[in-house]
Amino acid sequence: MVKRIFSFLCVGAILAGMLAGCGGTAATNGVVSVYNWGEYMDTDLFDEFTEQTGIRVNYSTYESNEAMYTKLRSGSVNYDVIIPSDYMISRLIDEGMLMKLDFDQIPNYANIDEQYRNMIYDPNNEYSVPYTWGTTGIIYNPNMVQQPITKWADLFDEEKVGTHSVLMFDNSRDCIAIALMALGYDINTTDASQITEAVDLLVKQKQDGIVQAYVMDQIFDKMTNNEAAAGVYYAGDYLIMVEDN
C-alpha cells in the first residue's frame, strides 16, 4: 500500500567547463556524457539518439544527490549533462559548477508548463530545465506491520512497524523532510528549533532499532522481496512493485 506524501522534481543541467555551445565534448568527440539516477531512462533510446545525431551517449548512474555531488566535486570524472534533484541545483549554482543554458538550442523548452519555470532553486531559469516530476510516498507490506500505517509519524513508532523494519532514504534532505512532516512542520521550514527536533527524531528512530537501512534504489528490490515492512519511495515505482508482489 502507498500513502502519497511530498513531491520531487528532477532537473537537467550542464556542468561548467563541459559543454559550451557547440564547443563541448559532444561536438568535438562525438560523445555526450550523461549522469542520471538509476532506472530513469530506457537505454534503447540512446541508439535512436545516435542514429539521429551521430553522437554517442556515455551513460552513468548514481543512487543519491550526495553521491553524485561528491564524485563531481572530486574532479575525477567529467560529465556533460547531469540530472539532480531540485535542491542540489541550488548548491551547484552557488558553487559555480553549472553553465548557463542557451535556450535557443532547446526549442522544446516551450513545452515546459509555466508552473515548473522560474523555480526557487533556479529563479531566473538560467541553468536548468525540468526533466520529471512526481510524488514520494510511504510503501508498506500489510502482512509485515503490526498495524496499518496511516501517517508519517507511524514510521517512527515501534508499536506500528516493529524493529529493523523501515527503509529510509539515504540523503539528509528527504530524511529531514519526512521527520518534519511526522512532527507536523513544513518540509521547507527554516526554523532552527524545528529542524533540530526533526534531527533528534531521526536519531531516536535509529537508536530504537526501527531503521533496517538507509538506501535508495535498493528499496525497490527489498520491498518487492519482502525484506522490509515499510519504506519511503517513489509512487511510480509502487505501481511496478504491486505487479511483482
Role assignments for model-derived ranges:
Residues 20, 37, 85, 104, ...:
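Conserved residues at the C-terminal ends of beta-strands
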Residues 62, 84, 215, 232-233:
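Short beta-strand and adjacent tight-turn residues that come in two discontinuous sequence segments
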